[in-house]
């Protein structure tokens, strides 16, 4: 019996070891508890459906259809060639914005890196972005922006006199882009000659079209045109930078007059100054960020005020009270803008319904769990403004235009996110508020209007844009 006993003991030991190894192997190889969802077709994933809902004017459909299907505020998919977790709702916004550089970091598609290549040999686009965010706050904080209000008003007045006055009909979106781009050129690098600014305008539109196109670098493709446009603008910016360096040396330019001067005179922790190509890259990024989203907001302000006369009347009343309180010819100032409370609530409601920034990507820098689901390192995460902006749990009757949502304490935290949030919140948020309010003031003082195409379609690609650029019929106020 003894041999049988030892044989049984050996078999028991082997069985135990085998089961242990199987358990360890199975645990390591078992699938992660990923959020529910489908990855779509090979390579393209669900990118076409993600984009097509925007082209049809309802980008939120991609989000809400899947939230309902999976009964979850997190779902997995594959977009822009990446395994992605789409994070919906205020709790997701809070989690992502609060864990920047802890669990997640900013991420851009490769196409963006190719259109905006960093010129620093030891940095990447993320590191350059971090450096910029350390540089910008002193220019975009309210106390610094106060001195720009009058300049913005001068530029807005000239813009309306030149492009709106004495016109029966105008097309809003191109003019809104012209206004915000001229402001950015003037305030970031003191360029205000419209002919000089116009030289940049068309290439910038090519860049905007190429960023969201397929990254196919062949002659004639939008992506190829965007790369060429980026290179052209860089060369033009370097000419401006070289001249500013001369002007600073000769004392004809001020060290504090704009961001460009500051960049030329700023050195890093090692005492090294930025080279001209590096500065050109940063100014290029600022010019894009400084006018694209604001021009969308201004365009949709015109759209909604044209559709909602009762809202227009309240904005007009507030703006005329401010105008009548000032001596003739006096420019707007900081105190005037602080009085535009209802007007800003209207602007916020516009950005809730038509957020210029539809969402943003992050990349998981480590494995982590969220809401009971595994998020693997390297996966991308996408937050969506529409997941809260058009969610009845966050904003009752979400399709109704109601500026009173922003009275008092306003919306609940992390539900209204037109500028993002956390460390990556748009540093130009206050700057955007100024340019939008100055635009609104000069607009409603001059005109009422109606849409030429009452049911004009909206396209989101990647910003919301009226399909025909919003033509309107102008009715000047009688003197």
Curated annotation (Swiss-Prot):
The keyword Lipid biosynthesis does not apply. CDD domains: CYP90-like (cd11043). It is found in: Membrane. Disruption phenotype: Severe reduction in root and shoot size. It comes from Medicago truncatula (Barrel medic). Its EC number is 1.14.14.126. It is an enzyme of class 1 (oxidoreductase). Pfam families: p450. Heme binds at residue 426. Its cofactor is heme. Signal peptide: none annotated. One of its GO terms (biological process) is saponin biosynthetic process. Belongs to the cytochrome P450 family. Expressed in roots, nodules and flowers. The keyword Cytoplasm does not apply. It is a single-pass membrane protein. This is Beta-amyrin 28-monooxygenase. One of its GO terms (molecular function) is beta-amyrin 28-monooxygenase activity. Keywords: Heme, Iron, Membrane, Metal-binding, Monooxygenase, Oxidoreductase, Transmembrane, Transmembrane helix. It comes from the Eukaryota. GO terms for cellular component: membrane. Involved in an early step in the hemolytic saponin biosynthetic pathway. It catalyses: beta-amyrin + 3 reduced [NADPH--hemoprotein reductase] + 3 O2 = oleanolate + 3 oxidized [NADPH--hemoprotein reductase] + 4 H2O + 4 H(+). The chain crosses the membrane at residues 5-25.
